[in-house]
């Protein structure tokens, strides 16, 4: 049994399908679900729309969970990428989801980070780089990583950060360069 946030997103659906192929039961957390996920008996869909993360524990079946994959992140492209309110909310959600991971008895969280973490870190150490809106997203990812790792440690959860960079494929609908170039 595993839990996946952002399960209905571009990367989330691919991960869920790979997990299902390996025989896992998936608890999918997202704001909406397509029919493929919603109609699969191996998937338990839990809507997070208009809910506090602390309310979700009672909706997650009491099972032994091997891993909690945190993919959910608003504002990965477009104007929301530079919206500090959106990105700060993402940081809080990441920490709240890690606490939820511990609350449901899962001892391992995989946190989906971004290459923008490294770019932001370089920006913070340099006097030669002008700030841009994308650094708000990167700073959010970096903050979520650092705070999330701490929250995980304080709650007895193994924290595994993974960097996802320039991924594209079937189902992607972002405003990022590769997707928009392919569609032109």
Can you say where each PLM-predicted feature lies in the sequence?
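SDR active-site strand-loop-helix element
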Residues: 5, 29, 68-74, 109-115, ...
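Conserved Rossmann-fold NAD(P)-dependent oxidoreductase catalytic core, especially the SDR/UDP-sugar
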Residues: 68-70, 95-136
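NAD(P)-dependent short-chain dehydrogenase/reductase
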Residues: 146-184
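Conserved glycine-rich Rossmann-like NAD(P)H-binding loop of the short-chain dehydrogenase/reductase
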Residues: 24-35
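N-terminal Rossmann NAD(P)H-binding glycine-rich loop of SDR-like oxidoreductase domains
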Residues: 2-22
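NAD(P)H-binding glycine-rich loop region in Rossmannoid oxidoreductase-like domains
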Residues: 50-89
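Rossmann-fold cofactor-recognition segment
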Residues: 40-53
């Amino acid at each position: 049994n595993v839990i996946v946030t952002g399960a209905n997103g571009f990367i989330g659906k691919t991960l869920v399908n790979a997990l299902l192929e390996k025989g896992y039961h998936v608890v999918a957390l997202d704001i909406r679900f397509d029919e493929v996920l919603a109609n699969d008996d191996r998937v338990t869909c839990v809507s997070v729309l208009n809910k506090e993360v602390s309310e979700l524990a009672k909706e997650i079946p009491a099972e032994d969970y091997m891993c909690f994959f945190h993919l959910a992140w608003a504002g990965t492209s477009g104007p929301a990428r530079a919206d500090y309110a959106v990105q700060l909310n993402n940081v809080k959600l990441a920490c709240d989801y890690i606490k939820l991971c511990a609350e449901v008895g899962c001892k391992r969280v995989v946190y989906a980070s971004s290459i923008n973490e490294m770019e932001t870190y370089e920006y913070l150490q340099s006097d030669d780089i002008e700030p841009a809106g994308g650094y708000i997203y990167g700073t959010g990812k970096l903050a979520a990583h650092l705070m999330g790792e701490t929250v995980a440690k304080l709650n007895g959860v193994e924290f595994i950060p993974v960097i996802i960079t320039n991924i594209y494929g079937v189902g992607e609908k972002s405003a990022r360069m590769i997707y928009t170039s392919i569609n032109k």
